[in-house]
Amino acid sequence: MPLIDFDHVNLRTAHVAEMSEFYRTVLGLEVGARPAFSFAGAWLYCGERAVVHLVEVAEQPNPSGELRLEHFAFRARGFDELEQKLRVAGIEYRVSKLFGTEIRQLNFHDPEGNRIHLDFPDG
């Protein structure tokens, strides 16, 4: 049973609206259709796929600040455009290059501290 592709990341949050806005404005994801679950939340889409699922919880998960998820990653295009967007928004980020390749990487955090890693295969 080989893996085929990345499907989605599921994040628990007490701030669904703020997190939705971040993923919409910074990464360009679109809020879209979501099944009628018995709990509140939002699904954010990259094209036809809901890649970020937000699940509303009463209080912020893991109040100690210790993250259980190290990072999640997307492939992307438009390195310069996104770097400028992060700079203008005042979002701290780190640029790196994947050793032995032309892949540039951007790493930054969403409003709740989850690390987002973007690979730009076109350098």
Model-derived segments and their meaning:
Residues 10-51:
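Core segments of cupin and vicinal oxygen chelate
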